[in-house]
């Protein structure tokens, strides 16, 4: 369990598929949890049952199957729910969402305890409807689905490069100590690309060694932090001269704008 010292909220990863995480948030004084992006139900049911917990609510970032497939089965098992009534927050385009939310909305995380509400942030780009959720504690926690990964970001599928760049700029502006909970264990693959862009980065070399050690012991590399990503992630560093020069050298072009650099960096990663 990833427990921030003194934090009233713990966050636990449930691995599913090949490198996905379902995140489970729990107030330390309660036995009900918030489940983030249940792409599969069986592992969540096993965890809930084993730890004698109940589900308070589910929150969803976007509509892809590996984030939503478990919703229906979890909702059908009413005995799993604290109030025997499924509560699913997320984009309105998702069929199983019972409580549609959008940018600027707030979600009560825990009843009867003094914890800030989750803040809903629109983060389109990977998908147009993509939402992220910020828990503004002393050490904030961001659940960002497939928008930001450690040393990487989501592919452009039905969104646009401009949308994704704007979303990542907004995430980058969050407090540096913010913990980032994405839903894929892509870190080593992303570091490989980041080192291609900045081959002289000792910080990337050191981080790769750290992540390899974690993965060797079957431990997640997530959460990361905004501070780390601003130092290492090329998609948050696209305005840096070293990134601009790398992209221009890759394209054999000069004079790219920051928006051009970001777009071509993402296209470079797409074919990497």
Curated annotation (Swiss-Prot):
GO biological process terms on file: methylglyoxal catabolic process to D-lactate via S-lactoyl-glutathione
Record's cofactor remark: Binds 2 Zn(2+) ions per subunit.
EC numbers on record: 3.1.2.6
Family membership: Belongs to the metallo-beta-lactamase superfamily. Glyoxalase II family.
Stated role: Thiolesterase that catalyzes the hydrolysis of S-D-lactoyl-glutathione to form glutathione and D-lactic acid.
Pfam family, one: HAGH_C
InterPro entries: Clx_II_MBL (IPR035680), Glyoxalase_II_hydrolase (IPR050110), HAGH_C (IPR032282), Hydroxyacylglutathione_Hdrlase (IPR017782), Metallo-B-lactamas (IPR001279), RibonucZ/Hydroxyglut_hydro (IPR036866)
Name of encoding gene: gloB
GO molecular function: hydroxyacylglutathione hydrolase activity; metal ion binding
Superkingdom assignment: Bacteria
Protein name according to UniProt: Hydroxyacylglutathione hydrolase
SUPFAM superfamilies (alphabetical): Metallo-hydrolase/oxidoreductase
Cofactor(s) essential for the protein: Zn(2+)
Binding annotation for Zn(2+) 1: 62, 64, 126, 146
Sorted UniProt keywords: Hydrolase, Metal-binding, Zinc
Disulfide pattern: none
Pathway the protein takes part in: Secondary metabolite metabolism; methylglyoxal degradation; (R)-lactate from methylglyoxal: step 2/2
Subunit-structure text: Monomer.
Cited HAMAP family: Glyoxalase_2
Gene3D superfamilies, alphabetized: Ribonuclease Z/Hydroxyacylglutathione hydrolase-like
Binding positions for Zn(2+) 2 per the UniProt entry: 66-67, 146, 184
Reaction equations catalysed: an S-(2-hydroxyacyl)glutathione + H2O = a 2-hydroxy carboxylate + glutathione + H(+)
